[in-house]
A protein has these predicted regions:
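Anion-binding alpha/beta catalytic cores of soluble intermediary-metabolism enzymes, centered on
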Residues: 1-197
Length: 197
């Protein structure tokens, strides 16, 4: 199964994944499970009060899981400079500092700057709010004109990779070709034999 293949690829390798909603009990439970099984090194974002409050209310033990408070990040000035540079005149320092109060922007910059390997969000944030920072700060992979997404659908023994159900609203013919190629590439990376329909 796709999930098993992904787990094998990252397990025990110290892959750091940022969870933008560290105050959500579902996120905390997932982070605990991933850490206990040495799948990834989860990083919970949020204030100490938010994270501890959620853990206490839900009888969860998040001790030993890295937590980063965007309000007290020691490399914030470096992050602000980098984000101003990436936004190239679209956001000044003041606007960047405001944006970085959002854990979606903050988490995306942690990935962009190499402090984390990936990001998971969307438990409480909308898809648009989760994806927008990545579109603005990470950009498309080299050789690609656009960014697309894919969903993994698993039901019993059936596995499907559905291409771009949420990013490109009205793709033209060329876009559809690129989305198809990107989705097929993602499927192969997951160890799935591709049949494009």
């Amino acid at each position: 199964m796709i999930i098993d293949e992904l787990e094998k690829k990252v397990q025990g390798k110290g892959v750091r994944i940022v969870f933008t909603e560290g105050w959500d009990p579902r996120v905390q439970k997932a982070a605990i499970d991933l850490k206990n099984n040495d799948v990834v090194c989860p990083v919970l974002l949020g204030t100490p009060e938010e994270i501890a409050g959620c853990a206490q209310k839900n009888s969860l033990n998040v001790e030993g899981i890295e937590q980063i408070d965007p309000n007290n990040f020691e490399h914030m000035d470096e992050m602000v400079r980098k984000m101003v540079e990436l936004r190239r005149g679209k956001m000044d320092e003041e606007k960047v500092r405001t944006a970085l109060k959002s854990t979606n922007y903050f988490g995306t910059m942690l990935v962009q700057m190499g402090y984390a390997d990936g990001l998971l969000g969307g438990a409480t944030y909308s898809t648009a709010d989760t994806v927008r920072p990545a579109l603005q700060l990470v950009k498309a992979a080299p050789g690609n004109k656009l960014v697309s997404s894919c969903f993994i659908l698993i039901k019993e023994e059936t596995q499907l990779i559905m291409g771009d159900c949420s990013i490109n609203i009205n793709p033209n013919t060329d876009d559809l070709v690129e989305i198809t190629m990107q989705t097929a590439k993602s499927a192969r990376q997951f160890g799935v034999e591709t049949k494009v329909a």
